[in-house]
Amino acid sequence: MEAPAITRRRRPFLAPIWLPALLGVIAVVLAVLAYRSVTTTTVVLVRHAEKALSTIDDPPLSPEGEQRSERLAQIFGEREGAGHLDAIYVTNTRRTQQTAAPLAARLRLVPVVLSGVDVAGTAARLLSEHRGGTLLIIGHSNTLPQLVRELSGKDIKPIAENDYSDIYVLSVPRLGGASVLRMKY
């Protein structure tokens, strides 16, 4: 008597199950990657609040500047929900740090001190680190126009020495053109 031949039996009924599941997983991964690539980053830029009239190199805020910094905290002070700030950036000057202080305390954020003169590099780094987030940059009349240009590709008019009331809101999508909204506070 001859031994029966061993044959491998295929299970064709499993292919219709695992193949669509695999394709579904691939589709989800691609959708997540596509979403991350088109996510919009919101950058809010303001000039530091009014500084005290002083002969020192790094003057503190004036009483008007302290009031303005409190208004900034009221405007952006929500910790949750749409439009909340993920990070606050300041320069190494007392007036930018004092402008940020009430808002940072309310949000329980530690302001990050921007260093250096490489505006283009700083802009690229901030967009990369905060893709899809919302961040606030408190700067100076001579640096904010450069930052707006580097972040959005758009030019804004020079900021007057006595103008402390502008808020620039930049919407910077991963793909496509950025928009700049200018408001007063």
Identify the role of each PLM range.
Residues 2-34, 38-132, 143-185:
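Active-site-proximal alpha-helix that buttresses catalytic centers in soluble enzyme cores
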Residues 140:
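Conserved alpha/beta-hydrolase "nucleophile elbow" surrounding the catalytic nucleophile
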